[in-house]
Curated annotation (Swiss-Prot):
The active site is at 316, 372. It comes from Corynebacterium glutamicum (strain ATCC 13032 / DSM 20300 / JCM 1318 / BCRC 11384 / CCUG 27702 / LMG 3730 / NBRC 12168 / NCIMB 10025 / NRRL B-2784 / 534). Belongs to the citrate synthase family. Citrate synthase is found in nearly all cells capable of oxidative metabolism. Weakly inhibited by ATP (apparent Ki = 10 mm). This is Citrate synthase. Homohexamer.
Length: 437
């Protein structure tokens, strides 16, 4: 192994020292957070590439959308603190903010809401697509496939270099993805599809299409509507995570917005990304059923590595402090469960949190509750099936995906993403004839 190091200079440059020479790199300055070293022609001039599995220290892009300070527990969309937005804005306002860069004026918000409201209907032929999927298909697979298929119905909105087409595709996706999710749910239940009602707002419409029936009026619960809106805001963007990076990767090939978003949905379906709230709920149910509801006993097992017990919903790849979304979700969980009826699993969750926040084992490992710890309890109380939780995550993350897709297309010097690798396979060898192997 050879020695190398990178040092900063006084002229806003960084210098890489490696066997055979030095390589000078520009430093790009962030408005907040970590500055970046621009590798530029490093490969051609040094013969070296960077090696960073999982992109732990690699910035793939410049972005103006979301800022995270994991050490301080800060999350901001376009400069606005997440707590401020969750308390004082609607999901559609936040969606507009992420996609357009500024909060909408009253007229702009009215137009945005109106466009979404009047594009919720699906082509009647589209409904037959849901009959193709098995009743036990995971709704994330159905949703991703449906968004892919949606692109075939809007072939005049597929050019990623046409701003007018991008605007139309943005509205179609914002309007129709929740409808696709609701239809996927109805199809696997064998329940009749519900047409959207333009007299309702987007969240009211979604809940009605999920749980209503055409034979009777659906009673809107404003507390449930507000809670769902708030949860979607909390999930609307989270910088360069796996699914967002997937959307940007696909979009870098100038694939259309529909198929790029479908790729993000597929990435989100992975249990390490979007399935954590389901895992938390399953953990709580396991503690109740198999550990007598004893939170202390369970947490002791977590600390004993030989027991192999995992604590779900604690810790985060980015946050080394309390996830700023978690406190908002916890408060929302209290509100919704108090309204809909108590849940002994909430009491159990609170007990687990209290133990973790007072125990040096968890504190030293920075294992604080994350956004997923309480969301599953809320979704279950609302009546959503457990395997539908990630679909709700996707609906919330949709405006963030759209914002990143569009930002990347408009970036100066945008190129198709093409990571490098360090090859560790066989060196050149001759093919051995089949009969001699």
């Amino acid at each position: 192994m050879f020695e190398r190091d990178i040092v900063a200079t006084d002229n806003n440059k960084a210098v890489l020292h490696y066997p055979g020479g030095e390589f000078e790199m520009d430093i790009i300055e962030a408005s907040e957070g970590n500055n970046g070293v621009v590798l530029g022609k490093m490969l051609s001039e040094t013969g070296l590439i960077t090696f960073d599995p999982g992109y732990v220290s690699t910035g793939s892009t410049e972005s103006k959308i979301t800022y995270i300070d994991g050490d301080a527990g800060i999350l901001r969309y376009r400069g606005y603190d997440i707590a401020d937005l969750a308390e004082n804005a609607t999901f559609n306002e936040v969606s507009y903010l992420l996609i357009n860069g500024e909060l909408p004026t009253p007229d702009e918000l009215h137009k945005f809401n109106d466009e979404i409201r009047h594009h919720t209907l699906l082509d009647e032929d589209f409904k037959s697509q849901f009959n193709v999927f098995p009743r036990d298909a995971h709704p994330m697979a159905t949703l991703a496939s449906s968004v892919n298929i949606l692109s075939t119905y809007y072939q005049d909105q597929l050019n990623p270099l046409d701003e007018a087409q991008l605007d139309k595709a943005t509205v179609r996706l914002m309007a129709k993805v929740p409808m696709l999710a609701a239809y996927a749910h109805r199809a696997r239940k064998g329940a009749p599809y519900m047409y959207p009602d333009n007299s309702l707002n987007a969240r009211e419409n979604f809940l009605r299409m999920m749980f209503g029936y055409p034979t009777e009026p659906y009673e809107i619960d404003p507390i449930m509507v507000k809670a769902l809106d708030k949860l979607l805001i909390l999930h609307a963007d989270h910088e360069q995570n796996c699914s967002t990076s997937t959307v940007r990767m696909i979009g870098s090939a100038q694939a259309n917005m529909f198929v790029s978003i479908a790729g993000g949905i597929n990435a989100l379906s992975g249990p390490l990304h979007g399935g954590a709230n389901q895992a938390v709920l399953e953990m709580l149910e396991d503690i109740k059923s198999n550990h007598g509801g004893d939170a202390t006993e369970f947490m002791n097992k977590v600390k004993n590595k030989e027991d192999g017990v995992r604590l779900m919903g604690f810790g985060h790849r980015v946050y080394k402090n309390y996830d700023p979304r978690a406190a908002i979700v916890k408060e929302t969980a209290h509100e919704i469960l108090e309204h809909l009826g108590g849940d002994d699993l909430l009491d159990l969750a609170i007990k687990l949190e209290e133990i973790a926040l007072a125990d040096d084992y968890f504190i030293s490992r920075k294992l604080y509750p994350n956004v997923d710890f309480y969301t599953g309890l809320i979704y279950r109380a609302m009546g959503f099936p457990t395997d539908f939780f990630t679909v709700l995550f996707a609906i919330g993350r949709l405006p963030g995906w759209i914002a990143h897709y569009r930002e990347q297309l408009g970036a100066a010097g945008n190129k198709i993403n093409r990571p490098r690798q360090v090859y560790t396979g066989n060196e050149s060898r001759k093919l051995v004839p089949r009969e001699e192997r």
